[in-house]
Amino acid sequence: MNLLFFLKPKNYVTYLTLDSTLRQGLEKMRNSGYTEIPVIDKDGLYAGTVRQGDFLWKILDNGYTDIREAENETIRAIVSRRILPVHIDTAIDELLTKALDQNFVPVIDDLDSFIGIITRRDIIKYFIEKNGSTTITAANFPASVQSAKASCNR
């Protein structure tokens, strides 16, 4: 199976740019209902992600009392590389291992351009549909995911 099967293309993904203001980022996050959003640079390269907590800490650290105060600062100030992308040719078991720890996995092409995301929800939905029920057994997952899960339970 190819990871493109799970890909949500960039034009269907809510994302921010490094030059978006904190206010724009907060509004986009509120309107989308997401708790974390990918960020790209002006050339379309994946720059990282921002989470709700990143906004909160920046607001608290700067003492903002009005959202309009966040209009002069950009997402660049809070973007993080905690969520690392996978290349388009990444093996499915590596994708599944990454999806264990993050809500979505950013996907980049050979030029490091952001091409979309794969959500943990879509992966789980696929396995539920494939299995015909909501009971998912370890046999449905590659061995590397099973060993990653086992190490988390220690």
Task: Set out the residue ranges of the language-model regions.
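The conserved cystathionine-beta-synthase
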Residues: 15-34, 40-41, 84-102, 108-110, ...
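Acidic (E/D-rich), amphipathic helical modules within compact regulatory domains
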Residues: 23-66
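Short glycine/threonine-rich beta-strand-turn micro-motifs
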Residues: 46, 113-114
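Tandem CBS (Bateman) regulatory domains
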Residues: 1-12, 51-102, 119-154
